[in-house]
Amino acid sequence: MVNRFDVFLVNLDAAPSGDAKNTRPGVVVSPDEMNRNVDHVIIAPLASTKARYPTRVAVEFLNGERMVILDQIRTVDKNRLVKKVGEIGESSREDVLDRLGEMFAK
């Protein structure tokens, strides 16, 4: 089962130039109803970069600060999810949802 806010290693090979490539951690941002009923999920890459942009959210993960890169969200087939490596914490979840709301609400 895949849940919103799970972090998976995601096979991102064949991504367009300039986007995150290879196998990278990604946060599932699609709602659980979608995750249960379709063969795709929406993910946002998780990176160790310290670059701060309005479309990125800092989270604590694997004993360090990571950035959820919401300006590179993408839909991927579930068979691209290689392995679950954790999930982001409660306070970070609200930050991600708030930022997504700002990006798409108006």
Question: Where does each model-flagged region fall?
Answer:
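Conserved functional hotspots at enzyme active or ligand-binding sites that engage polyanionic ligands
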Residues: 1-106
